[in-house]
Amino acid sequence: MQIILLQRIVNLGKLGETVDVKPGYGRNFLIPLGKALPATKANIEKFEARRAELEAEEAKEVAVAQERADALADVNVIMRAKSGDEGKLFGSIGTRDIAEALTNSGLEVDRAEIKLPEGTLRQIGEYNVDIQLHHDVTATILVTILSEDGDNEDLDENDATDENEE
């Protein structure tokens, strides 16, 4: 089944491309969600008439995502968790915890936007975490995990100033 993409879809194509997909994927997913149109002559003409509008919407989304990325550029999230003697956490810190900490600091981030390629964080330390705000826009934040016991002497001086960013 040939379809016209109305937005960029990972591993498939970008806005305006005509691609072949399995009929079920096109009929049951892409077309009902408004991500594509069947590639008929009438739909191709409709798309070409709306092409500039769709490209402007895409550019606007990228600009908004870039603004959010700029706001997240220098963010350092400090989280405290119970840990053992070797710095291993009792439990873990995942995307939900990081999203909650960012939301509490006034930055709206959905947990689906946070990417932890190696899984949840299970050790005390500093981690660079990517936040995928748009297909083309990714921000990186620093997540610092400290022990609730207060055994981190080197970071205790900075806690008073960075505590508000949590």
Swiss-Prot record:
Membership in a protein family: Belongs to the bacterial ribosomal protein bL9 family.
Biological function: Binds to the 23S rRNA.
GO CC field: ribonucleoprotein complex; ribosome
UniProt keyword rRNA-binding present: yes
Record PANTHER family: 50S RIBOSOMAL PROTEIN L9
The keyword ATP-binding belongs to this UniProt entry's keyword annotation: no
Pfam family, one: Ribosomal_L9_N
GO molecular function, one term: structural constituent of ribosome
Keywords: Ribonucleoprotein, Ribosomal protein, RNA-binding, rRNA-binding
PROSITE patterns documented for this protein: RIBOSOMAL_L9
This protein's name: Large ribosomal subunit protein bL9
GO biological process: translation
InterPro entries in alphabetical order: Ribosomal_bL9, Ribosomal_bL9/RNase_H1_N, Ribosomal_bL9_bac/chp, Ribosomal_bL9_C, Ribosomal_bL9_C_sf, Ribosomal_bL9_N, Ribosomal_bL9_N_sf
